[in-house]
């Protein structure tokens, strides 16, 4: 029996049955009172007010508070060097490598945040948190440890006022984007910015409990716990959390975008909507009618974000927008807010195009409203567009240049028409993006990087073999040759297939074993959606038949 078969059987053995399922607990801070939700894998089972007595172990959350202190007090970076001396380094880095603050928070590297290593004095720590009226457990370094039990209410209180939380929220988006948490970003988008935690359940060393705590994108504190590790909680309950967690519609990025409206069309005059008198240059508030020199006209609304300028006798309309409002307005102009999955994919493409193509002027990005770049609605974004944009706030698709078109579909260009069709077939936004941009990866605005280290020689070898194998494979029930896919280098662990992103992860491409791994993972993708695609014996037998034929 090969290792793939062993891993598959172990996974089946360890999966909990519905009868054994312990409800997931989710707490959201509300305007009037905090709400406690109990969730099963199929939905909400109970909602009640949060009892003051509900407690939680801190688990790994203590690291978030050290991170906040380091950021807020502007402590210099002190990288942790991995030397292979501690088993805890598995959460940090490989021997010979080092890890910095942001990455340590995402990976939950406790060795980095150890107060003794960072020379954090108990008096300095206590004074800092006492000045901020923090809970007693937070003001004492001796109680800042995983086993410390605190009330969930006090935890939410501390998160609501946590210093440097904007920076922490930005960095913690990488937790959701972790490629090992398959399906989480697909279901939750960028709505949660959380630090994961795991600990022992009720002091029973053999039973784990885990979850996460942090914020929604609008700053609402939340806390979650369930049976298993934080990773299993996230992956198992991502679908139901998607249905329960709200989507804020008024979210700002703090990044400004300056847009010259109607950049390619000379303006003749601007009037109030029900007037024929041209308005003077200045900030615009209200409904206006712009007339172009070609005789066409359009009505738009400004709430002070758009200014009429006159430069060398030529009129110019310039809007000063938050980045996420800009994305929503482009969605309104270039596409629609429905179907949702296509719209979500479009917002990521729009945001990525902006990052790749905008110029900078001071603190703002600058980009013209033009069919040569991106067309922008002159009026405020619709609620639907803002909702779709908020769902993917800060997400980009890092890697190769990104383009999109209304109807034309080519590699590197997302077709809106095709995206709507894919959404109609049940594909999620990340699958739509993966089809259009197979070599790119979901990433965040502040740290654009592709998680797929491409193996072009492996992909070229597979592309050459596919026509040769077609005669054999087309005779197999369930075979569906994938149109696009990527072959990526595996950083650690066993080779695997990310079916949603259509990515094959293998260690390298030098040996016969590498070719066996690549073929094996390709077959998992080619038989995706059919029972044989999950049959390790079938896939392994077919792999050897293809390579030994």
UniProtKB/Swiss-Prot annotation:
Question: Signal as a keyword?
Answer: yes
InterPro entries hit by this protein = Beta-lactam/transpept-like, DUF2300_secreted, SpoIID/LytB_N
Q: What residue stretch is flagged as signal peptide? A: 1-19
| Keyword field | Signal
Q: What is this protein called?
A: Uncharacterized protein YfaQ
What are the leading ranks of the lineage? Bacteria, Pseudomonadati, Pseudomonadota, Gammaproteobacteria, Enterobacterales
């Amino acid at each position: 029996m090969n290792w793939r078969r062993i891993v598959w059987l172990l996974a089946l053995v360890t999966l909990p049955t519905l009868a054994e399922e312990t409800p997931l607990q989710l707490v959201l801070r509300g305007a009037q009172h905090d709400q406690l939700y109990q969730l099963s894998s199929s939905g909400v089972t109970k909602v009640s007010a949060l009892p003051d007595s509900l407690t939680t172990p801190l688990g790994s959350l203590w690291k978030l508070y050290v991170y906040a202190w380091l950021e807020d007090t502007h402590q210099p970076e002190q990288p942790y060097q991995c030397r292979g001396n501690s088993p805890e380094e598995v959460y940090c880095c490989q021997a010979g490598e080092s890890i910095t603050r942001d990455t340590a928070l995402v990976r939950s590297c406790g060795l980095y945040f150890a107060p003794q290593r960072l020379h954090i004095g108990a008096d300095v720590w206590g004074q800092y948190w006492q000045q901020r009226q923090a809970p007693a457990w937070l003001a004492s370094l001796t109680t800042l440890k995983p086993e410390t039990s605190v009330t969930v209410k006090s935890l939410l209180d501390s998160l609501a006022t946590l210093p440097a939380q904007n920076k922490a929220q930005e960095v913690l988006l990488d937790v959701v984007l972790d490629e090992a948490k398959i399906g989480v970003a697909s279901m939750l988008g960028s709505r949660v910015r959380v630090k994961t935690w795991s600990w022992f359940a009720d002091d029973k060393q053999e039973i784990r409990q885990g979850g996460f705590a942090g914020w929604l994108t609008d700053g609402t504190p939340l806390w979650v716990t369930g049976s298993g590790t934080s990773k299993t909680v996230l992956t198992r309950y991502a679908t139901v959390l998607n249905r329960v967690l709200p989507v804020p519609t008024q979210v700002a990025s703090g990044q400004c975008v300056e847009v010259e409206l109607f950049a390619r069309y000379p303006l003749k005059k601007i009037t109030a909507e029900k007037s024929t008198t041209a308005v003077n240059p200045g900030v615009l508030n209200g409904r206006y009618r712009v007339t172009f020199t070609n005789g066409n006209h359009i009505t738009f609304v400004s709430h002070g974000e758009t200014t009429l300028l006159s430069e060398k006798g030529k009129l110019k309309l310039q809007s000063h927008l938050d980045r996420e409002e800009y994305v929503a307005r482009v969605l309104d102009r270039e596409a629609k807010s429905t179907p949702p999955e296509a719209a979500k994919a479009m917002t990521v493409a729009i945001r990525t195009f902006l990052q790749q193509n905008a110029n900078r002027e001071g603190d703002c990005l600058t980009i013209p409203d033009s069919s040569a770049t991106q067309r922008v609605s002159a009026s405020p974004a619709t609620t639907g567009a803002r909702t779709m944009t908020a769902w993917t706030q800060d997400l980009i698709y890092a890697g190769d240049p990104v383009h999109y078109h209304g109807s034309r579909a080519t590699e590197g260009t997302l077709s809106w028409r095709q995206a709507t069709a894919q959404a109609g077939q049940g594909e999620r936004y990340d699958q739509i993006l993966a089809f259009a941009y197979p070599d790119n990866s979901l990433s965040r605005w502040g740290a654009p990087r592709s998680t797929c280290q491409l193996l072009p020689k492996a992909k070229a070898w597979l592309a050459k073999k596919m026509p040769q194998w077609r005669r054999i494979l087309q005779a197999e029930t369930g075979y569906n040759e994938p149109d696009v896919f990527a072959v990526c280098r595996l950083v650690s662990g066993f080779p695997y297939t990310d079916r949603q992103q259509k990515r094959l992860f293998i260690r390298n491409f030098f040996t016969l074993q590498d070719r066996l791994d690549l073929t094996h993972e390709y077959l998992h993708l080619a038989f995706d959606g059919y029972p044989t695609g999950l049959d390790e014996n079938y896939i392994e037998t077919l792999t050897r038949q293809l390579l030994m034929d």
